[in-house]
């Protein structure tokens, strides 16, 4: 009559002192993802998940909120201390997001531009007439 022990289903907190922060900016939204060195996603945040909707998601303030939330989660849950930053996209709030991550206390080792530039590839959409 041995008792069966229950295993805890709680996730163990992993310590992640070094990581990669991906900043993906577009004209409509900013998405910030924190990964480990291998590329496994640890946490993420976006302007939409920070509580903003519609036109406000495309502002620099929205990117600032998203970056602060992602950095806070990374420090709190994984004790992230230093990170590479990879930036993708043409959005308006790239520097704001980087500055907010730096202000949160994460040491930035590398800042790399990863945006793709077409060599006159696809035809752009027609101009809007309002």
Swiss-Prot record:
<keyword id="KW-0694">RNA-binding</keyword>
<keyword id="KW-0699">rRNA-binding</keyword>
<keyword id="KW-0687">Ribonucleoprotein</keyword>
<comment type="subunit">
    <text>Part of the 30S ribosomal subunit.</text>
</comment>
<keyword id="KW-0689">Ribosomal protein</keyword>
<dbReference type="GO" id="GO:0005840">
    <property type="term" value="C:ribosome"/>
</dbReference>
<dbReference type="GO" id="GO:0009507">
    <property type="term" value="C:chloroplast"/>
</dbReference>
<protein>
    <recommendedName>
        <fullName>Small ribosomal subunit protein uS11c</fullName>
    </recommendedName>
</protein>
<dbReference type="GO" id="GO:1990904">
    <property type="term" value="C:ribonucleoprotein complex"/>
</dbReference>
<comment type="similarity">
    <text>Belongs to the universal ribosomal protein uS11 family.</text>
</comment>
<keyword id="KW-0934">Plastid</keyword>
<dbReference type="GO" id="GO:0003735">
    <property type="term" value="F:structural constituent of ribosome"/>
</dbReference>
<dbReference type="Pfam" id="PF00411">
    <property type="entry name" value="Ribosomal_S11"/>
</dbReference>
<dbReference type="InterPro" id="IPR001971">
    <property type="entry name" value="Ribosomal_uS11"/>
</dbReference>
<dbReference type="GO" id="GO:0019843">
    <property type="term" value="F:rRNA binding"/>
</dbReference>
<keyword id="KW-0150">Chloroplast</keyword>
<dbReference type="InterPro" id="IPR036967">
    <property type="entry name" value="Ribosomal_uS11_sf"/>
</dbReference>
<dbReference type="GO" id="GO:0006412">
    <property type="term" value="P:translation"/>
</dbReference>
